A protein has these predicted regions:
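Flexible, glycine-rich beta-alpha linker
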Residues: 24-42
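Active-site Tyr-X1-5-Lys
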Residues: 1-24, 50-51
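Short, cationic motifs built from Arg/Lys/His that form the positively charged side of catalytic pockets
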Residues: 5, 27, 34, 64, ...
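Active-site micro-motifs of SAM-dependent methyltransferase domains
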Residues: 17, 30-33, 47, 62
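Short-chain dehydrogenase/reductase
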Residues: 1-9, 39-43, 65-66, 96
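C-terminal substrate-binding subdomain of Rossmann-fold SDR/epimerase-dehydratase oxidoreductases
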Residues: 43, 49-161
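Hydrophobic alpha-helix immediately C-terminal to the catalytic Tyr-X-X-X-Lys motif of short-chain
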Residues: 7, 11, 15, 45, ...
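Conserved hydrophobic/aromatic "anchor" residues
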Residues: 1, 15, 29-32, 66, ...
């Protein structure tokens, strides 16, 4: 998976150099929102919370940089208005949270005592333990993450419930 991403970026850079094409690559970190699919961790938790206070997850100590969909859309708008040369932009909130911390936030928002059942067999051996975005380049174009994690999680709960 990671290899195909790198290959795609190398191919894009080659096209830029060979054909003088303006190309912008957007690396989106852990995007979430109210209409996200349940195979992603945040909507998965919300769906499980609808039926029970027991949440079944894999590795709850993995840390991810969660970014709300409206911030991603705003990043695309800015990037599309600034395509010049070859650029790679990272889109993320620049802060990581563990899955356990996300569950604690949902516990507070829902008012339910959450019981986490972690199954380490669901953990992928190649998973990175801590992922944090560096959005410095994108911020130079005037972008910033506007949706706090707490507000974003609340929006997800309100839509899914």
């Amino acid at each position: 998976y990671a290899g195909s991403k790198i290959a795609g970026e190398i191919l894009c850079e080659s096209y830029h150099k060979q054909f003088n094409m303006d190309i912008s690559i957007v690396r989106i970190f852990s995007v979430y929102g109210p209409e996200s699919n349940n195979h992603l961790v945040i909507p998965n938790i919300v769906t499980q919370l609808k039926n029970s206070n027991i949440i079944k997850l894999g590795n709850i100590n993995s840390r991810r940089d969660f970014i709300f969909i409206s911030d991603v859309i705003n990043a695309f708008r800015i990037i599309l208005n600034n395509i010049n040369g070859f650029n790679v932009y990272n889109v993320g909130a620049e802060k990581s949270y563990s899955i356990k911390e996300i569950c604690k936030k949902f516990e507070k928002l829902s008012g339910k005592k959450i019981i986490i059942k972690s199954n380490l067999k669901q953990t992928r051996k190649f998973d990175v333990k801590n992922i944090v975005c560096d959005a410095t380049k994108l911020k130079k174009l005037g972008w910033k993450s506007k949706m706090s994690l707490d507000k974003g999680l609340k929006k997800c709960m309100n839509i899914k419930n």
